[in-house]
């Protein structure tokens, strides 16, 4: 998108670049704070499932098995091994004719029944020797995205049942339309500030002519500014852990405790254990639940509440400081991996991208590394970007960190669907005019450039249940609730 800009440098040689980026990465990771029930000052007003819906979308549109963290890379030489379109190839794979082991006729095969949440027909993914038989193996990398993949299998299967005269391809198109509709009309407005999205519309409709920075010749491509920086916003939304259901042992860390590796965690690439079915109302607002009481382990409402994503900010939770060896290594810090990848791929600084967009860049004083909580405490350090690594980042912030820090400046008070919640809403940082514009233009461009997408075939289309159809309705439909979809 901005390939004519000069790559950002953070030192005179490779060793200094890595050392300085490592210093920044250390400041971007919060102190240890284990998973807990109850409200949390780091929560946004975005239900937790949107973090993993974003991951599901990422697996639909991107796959890069070849770029390196040990040498400089030419971004033009990278290949996206996924189609850069929201076409659900991570769900459908190559279809029932080419991958019949995933299908039973034109419906998906489902896995073993799951227990623990009282959810009818909850099931694991179909597996062979523990490995999931699905369109993209990455959608089994943690328990949440794995169960969402299984839910999407059920969404397709119910669509088949409700439309028994349709062919596989016709059902597939309807599933894609609903998924794309949610991505455009629910997911994007959750993570991108309304002022950014408004600039991409004409008379309330997204307008291809408003795409100012994302242009393709024949087919849409995957810009590194999106895949390596802007769309890595989800890493800051991850909580230290999540409660799957009521059971005492189902408040789980995202990774195993290195001091107690046998303890349950949300690690994937294995069959679901007993009692691990997700109560979806803890992840998306299927119903109205109590908000809970902060720092009160005795309050029974805290175990049943809807969990919310952490705020989009320049801070990651402590478990992401050192990823398990089976996930990543050298480096094991997720923040450093992101920063190094952006540098080795030659990304410009956030300030340079802002100027190229004809925007006034954030000042160094506005680029705060740390949690965007309302009232920072002793455990919430707020570090100005210019004070890190002897000022090497002054006026020269890595694009990923810049985009996360920018969100702090674009907060919206979100009213959340919970009894007892703050009447004024929850302050929720959203992607601003640099990060949000990159994400929104790539989403829209991928759809405008795909001749089979909802924006290309029928931009006025809405689900039969109404224009308010959202992720919660997609989940409810997959669970067998609500009216049929056609």
Q: Language-model segments: which ranges?
A:
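Active-site nucleophile-adjacent alpha helix/oxyanion-hole segment immediately C-terminal to the catalytic cysteine
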Residues: 153-162
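Terminal regions of secretory-pathway proteins
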Residues: 1-138, 142-143, 161-486
């Amino acid at each position: 998108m901005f390939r004519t800009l000069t790559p950002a440098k953070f030192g005179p040689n490779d060793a200094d670049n890595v050392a300085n980026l490592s210093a920044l990465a250390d400041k971007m990771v919060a102190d240890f704070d284990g998973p807990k029930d109850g409200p949390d000052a780091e929560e946004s007003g975005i239900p937790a499932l949107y973090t993993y819906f974003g991951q599901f979308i990422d697996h639909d549109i991107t796959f890069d098995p070849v770029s390196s963290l040990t040498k400089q890379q030419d971004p033009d030489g990278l290949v996206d091994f996924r189609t850069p379109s929201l076409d659900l190839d991570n769900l459908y794979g190559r279809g029932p004719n080419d991958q019949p082991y995933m299908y039973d006729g034109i419906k998906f095969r489902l896995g073993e029944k799951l227990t623990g949440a009282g959810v009818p027909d909850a099931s694991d993914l179909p597996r062979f020797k523990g490995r999931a038989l699905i369109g993209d193996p990455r959608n089994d990398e943690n328990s949440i995205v794995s169960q969402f993949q299984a839910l999407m299998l059920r969404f397709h299967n119910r669509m088949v049942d409700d439309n028994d005269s349709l062919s596989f391809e016709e059902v597939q198109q309807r599933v894609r339309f609903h998924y794309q509709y949610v991505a455009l009309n629910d997911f994007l407005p959750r993570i991108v500030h309304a002022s950014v999205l408004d600039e991409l519309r004409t008379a309330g409709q997204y307008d291809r002519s408003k795409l100012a920075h994302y242009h393709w010749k024949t087919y849409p491509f995957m810009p590194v500014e999106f895949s390596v920086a802007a769309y890595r916003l989800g890493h800051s939304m991850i909580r230290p852990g999540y409660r799957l259901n009521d059971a005492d042992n189902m408040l789980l860390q995202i990774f195993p405790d290195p001091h107690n590796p046998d303890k349950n965690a949300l690690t994937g690439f294995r069959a679901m254990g007993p009692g691990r079915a997700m109560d979806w109302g803890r992840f998306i607002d299927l119903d109205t639940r109590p908000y809970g009481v902060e720092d009160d382990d005795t309050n029974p409402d805290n175990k049943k509440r809807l969990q919310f994503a952490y705020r989009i900010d320049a801070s990651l939770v402590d478990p992401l400081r050192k990823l398990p060896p089976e996930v990543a290594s050298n480096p094991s810090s997720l923040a450093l991996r992101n920063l190094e990848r952006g540098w080795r791929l030659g990304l410009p600084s956030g300030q340079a991208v802002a100027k190229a967009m004809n925007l006034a860049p954030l000042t160094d004083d506005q680029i705060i590394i740390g949690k965007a909580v309302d009232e920072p405490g002793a455990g919430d350090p707020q570090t100005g970007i210019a004070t890190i690594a002897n000022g090497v980042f002054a006026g020269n912030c890595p694009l990923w960190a810049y985009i996360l820090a920018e969100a702090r400046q674009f907060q919206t008070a979100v009213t959340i669907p919970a009894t007892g919640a703050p009447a004024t809403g929850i302050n929720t940082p959203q992607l601003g005019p640099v990060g949000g514009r990159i994400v929104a233009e790539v989403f829209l461009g991928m759809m405008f450039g795909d001749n089979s997408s909802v924006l290309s075939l029928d931009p006025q289309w809405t689900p039969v249940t109404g224009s308010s159809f959202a992720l919660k309705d997609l989940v409810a439909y997959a669970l067998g609730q609500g009216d049929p979809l056609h």
